[in-house]
Each structure stands twice: as structure tokens, then as C-alpha cells.
Regions:
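Short His-centered aromatic/hydrophobic patch
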Residues: 90-95, 111
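N-terminal strand-loop element at the rim of the active site
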Residues: 10-12, 27-65, 210
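Acidic donor-binding loop of glycosyltransferase active sites
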Residues: 246-260, 273
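Conserved donor-binding/catalytic core segment of Leloir-type glycosyltransferases
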Residues: 133-135, 148-154, 158-205
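Nucleotide-activated donor-binding/catalytic signature segment of Leloir-type glycosyltransferases, i.e.
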Residues: 206, 218-239
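A charged, aromatic-enriched C-terminal amphipathic alpha-helix characteristic of glycosyltransferases
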Residues: 300-343
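Short acidic/histidine- and often glycine-rich active-site loop of Leloir-type glycosyltransferases
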Residues: 279-290, 294-295
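Short hydrophobic beta-strand element within catalytic cores of glycosyltransferases
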Residues: 270, 274-277
């Protein structure tokens, strides 16, 4: 089939370092190409081609004229590709589909962020009964929506070839790891409290926030605590991530928001490293409490979990990813949705 995949333009496909959704787009495009499909991609500068057409589009600034122009420009770009397309898979903004929804080409809209009802209403209003499918990445992401029954849930996956299973981390000193944006929502301050309470060193990997509020949080709540058994090593690439996760005692995932799916959790499990996570949002769908990690309701619960990591068989973590969260499993489920529209 001829598949057009649309991604936001903020980061290239594949991403260089940070970029969860962009990594999923890359895995899907790569998997479709390997299975003999023609893959066209509309994405940001620096993106690679997957054999079909590569169409570069740019993110707008906040100024209204820029947003209006970029929207029109995107519609024109999509028009140049559509004659060679059997189905569209959109990973980006809902309004990318505005022109496409006026055609007879089937569209699949995959959501990465929390979903607002008005987005679904917008799509259904413009599609008017034509071929339109929705993909969510966790049950918790869609349960509050009208028409939630229209969603297919496809969990994110990881390429197991990029993550080495470590049966037992033996490189001293032992440490916990936090990997993600250094924001309050991600709970990096909680991770520090857990590590200090458990008496275990913490390695923090992630991007320094850019907006003023998150930068203030970093300067006041995180930076003063660095150096006391807590080391911030900055953003990491795939090789460094594999090493960092694989030799950690556990990944700390103390989120404070309804994150639809934290890809870093399955990256950690792929290495055999259990996850200590807040019991909220999608974490119960990913972590098997007591088997592949611990679901916790407080800092004290997380400290206790960090002291009981010896009860986790790391092989169970790897098996969980091989069974439910591999790239191949994910790609085959996307193909089930895409193949409905084969001629």
C-alpha cells in the first residue's frame, strides 16, 4: 500500500536525542518499508526518507499570520502528495487533516497527548461518515471521551535490538535513574527525594527546560539539590540511554500528570530494569506491580520499593516488552488498521 505518514515538524524523524513520538513514527515508517509498503513522509527539517516522497514542512511561530500561512502551506503540500496515497496516518496536529478530510482518502489519526473532546468533534464533523479511524496509546487516554468506542488502542513499542538485556547490573556504584524532561510534571524533584530517602545515588538524564516556569522550577527545586548523591548528566543519545538504563537498579517515573504513555518505561523494561512509578494514568497498563516494578502512591512507598528491588526478576521485565511492547507487535497492529483500506 501507499501510506502517507504525517508528523509534527518540531523534531526530525528519527530524533537525535529526545523525541518519543518521533521515535514511534520512525519505527512505523521503517517497519512499513521493510514489509514492502511505499512510505511517504511529511515531517520537519532533518528527517530521513523511507523510500517514498519526503515533504518538509515547518512549525509556525506564535504570531497569527505565521500560523495562518503555515496552515495554508501545509494544505498545499499535502495536495501535492495525495494523488499517490492510499491511506493517511497522522501523528501530528488535528488540523493537518482539514483538507485531507474533504477527500475520499481514508485517514487514521493517532493521538500522543491528552485528547480533548473538541478535537474528536472537529474530526467527525468534517469527515461526515467517511473512512476515519482513531488510535489511542492507552486506555486511560480515551476513557473520558464521547465515542471512545471508536478508538483502537495500540501501545507504543521499542526496537529490542537497540536495548541490551542486563541480567544483573554489576558496575559500581549502584544507582537509580531518572530520564525525562526536568519539569515538575515529570516529578524529577520527587525522584531526588526518593533516592536520598533510600540512600541510593541518582543519575538524572534529560533536557533543561526552556520555558520560564519550568526553568524557574529547575533553578529553585532541582539545581540546589544536585551534587548530594544526585548527578545531572544532561540529554543522552540511544547508545548512552541503553547503557544508563541497563546498569541502573531501577527507573524512577514519579509523574504528576495524566501521561498517556511514558515510552521510557518500556525502554527501561527492555533492558531488564524495573520501574518505580506513580500509580496513575497509564502506568498500571504498563507496569505489573511486584513483577516488573512497583506502582506507588507516595514518596514513602517509592522509598520502600527502592529497598525491595531484589524481589524483582529482571528477566520478567524483558519478557513483558517482548510480549506486549515490541516494535514488531506495534507495527503489526498499525498494519491491521491500515490494511482495512487496501484495494
Amino acid at each position: 500500500m501507499r501510506v502517507l505518514v504525517i508528523a509534527d515538524s518540531w523534531l526530525p524523524i528519527p530524533p537525535i536525542k529526545y523525541g518519543g513520538t518521533e521515535r514511534i513514527v520512525h519505527l512505523l515508517c521503517q517497519g512499513l518499508k521493510q514489509r514492502g509498503h511505499t512510505v511517504h513522509l511529511m515531517a520537519g527539517e532533518g528527517s530521513m526518507s523511507y523510500g517514498g516522497r519526503l515533504v518538509i514542512h515547518k512549525a509556525p511561530t506564535l504570531a497569527y499570520p505565521s500560523r495562518a500561512f503555515r496552515k495554508l502551506w501545509f494544505q498545499w503540500l499535502s495536495l501535492t502528495v495525495l494523488p499517490d496515497v492510499d491511506v493517511v496516518v497522522n501523528f501530528g496536529r488535528v488540523d493537518y487533516l482539514e483538507f485531507i478530510l474533504k477527500t475520499s482518502i481514508p485517514a487514521i489519526c493517532r493521538f500522543a497527548n491528552p485528547i480533548h473532546q473538541h478535537e474528536i468533534d472537529f474530526l467527525l464533523d468534517r469527515r461526515k461518515g467517511k473512512c476515519l479511524d482513531f488510535i489511542g496509546i492507552s486506555k486511560c487516554q480515551v476513557k473520558h471521551l464521547d465515542y471512545s468506542e471508536l478508538f483502537t488502542i495500540i501501545y507504543n513499542g521499542v526496537d529490542l535490538n537497540h536495548f541490551d538485556f542486563v541480567k544483573e547490573p554489576v558496575r559500581p556504584p549502584s544507582y537509580l535513574v531518572f530520564l525525562g524532561r526536568l519539569t515538575r510534571n515529570k516529578g524529577v524533584d520527587t525522584a531526588i527525594s526518593v533516592a536520598q530517602g533510600a540512600g541510593i545515588p541518582l543519575k538524572i538524564a534529560g533536557n533543561l527546560p526552556e520555558n520560564e516556569g519550568d526553568r524557574h522550577f529547575f533553578e529553585t527545586a532541582i539545581k540546589p539539590k544536585l551534587g548530594y548523591g544526585c548527578e545531572w548528566i544532561g540529554p543522552v543519545d540511544d547508545r548512552q540511554k541503553n547503557e544508563l538504563l541497563g546498569h541502573a537498579l531501577a527507573l524512577l517515573f514519579p509523574i504528576r500528570w495524566n501521561e498517556p504513555f511514558g515510552i521510557v518505561m518500556i525502554e527501561s523494561l527492555a533492558c531488564g530494569t524495573p520501574v518505580i512509578a506513580t500509580h496513575c494514568a497509564s502506568t498500571p497498563e504498563i507496569i505489573d506491580h511486584g513483577k516488573t516494578g512497583f506502582l506507588c502512591d507516595s514518596v514513602n512507598d517509592m522509598i520502600k520499593a527502592a529497598k525491595n528491588l531484589h524481589t524483582i526478576n529482571r528477566l520478567n521485565c524483558r519478557i513483558a516488552v517482548e510480549t506486549s511492547f515490541s516494535a514488531d507487535t506495534m507495527i503489526e497492529k498499525y498494519l491491521e488498521s491500515i490494511s482495512k483500506y487496501s484495494n
